[in-house]
Amino acid sequence: MNYQERLEQYVGIMSDFCRDPGKYRIDPFRIFGPLYYVGDKKVCIHLIDTGDGLVLIDSGYPNANHLLFDSIWRLGFDPKDVRLIIHTHGHYDHFGASNEFRLQFGTELAISRVDAEWMKKNPRFSLLEWAPSTPMAYDPPGFQVLIEDGQDLTVGNVTFHFELVPGHTPGVLAIFFDVKEGEKTLRAGLLGGVGLAAIHRYHLEEFGLPLSLPFDMLKKVRALKAEHVDIHLGNHPGNNQTLEKRAKQLVSGGNPFVEDSDWGGLLEDLEGRILDVIREENFMEE
């Protein structure tokens, strides 16, 4: 497969969602304590009530802004109280509503410094051409907070820890933070980009990305196995079976999102898939 074939395949898959995003809406819900799901069936968006304003992790597709605003209202929150949006990486399907929040409410926007620099260097980096119905005037947002590898950032009573995981983009963020419900504190974790089309040779060469990226990703994925995670969050629902877990919760009760083996399972699977790409593409580590 080449880049153009992959682009056409993706646009075909996404065309129905872009025409009728309301068909992909789901009711927002609490995951644990101050952590909520406000995304849709195509992309994950998480809301954290920090006690001193709200934080969003990603803001979804540009054609589904209304679904996000509606979900925030339905939970009893106000979109104007979103202080910060943390972006897992620099692809268009994760910053769709961010400019709206910044312009209307003064929300600060955060992303890794690495991806911010790539977006500035090459506007195509954000894959806006992959959006079947993106308005021509739609541009990547400006970012006020640039995150470094290993950095901590505190908002209200929540401290977010960031690890850089180059691969899906050079500046993908893994995000870890504690959430409390009653006397119980759990660790939430999210790996902000697990799709591997972006580490195939055709994609790397299309955007002038280093061929070392698959090896960089493999090294960091292995290192992340040391992180303890009680609640594995996805940045697309398939990453952690968001929709299946919610359906199970509605039928059986309990909290299927709390499962400390999910994180290790994700990383084991991802490690194997990265090695498959390296072998398939005959990449050689320098």
Explain the meaning of each model-derived region:
Residues P34, I48, D58, L68, ...:
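Divalent metal-coordination and catalytic microenvironments
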Residues D40-K41, S59-G60, T88-G90, S112-V114, ...:
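Active-site-proximal beta-strand/loop segments in catalytic clefts of secreted hydrolases
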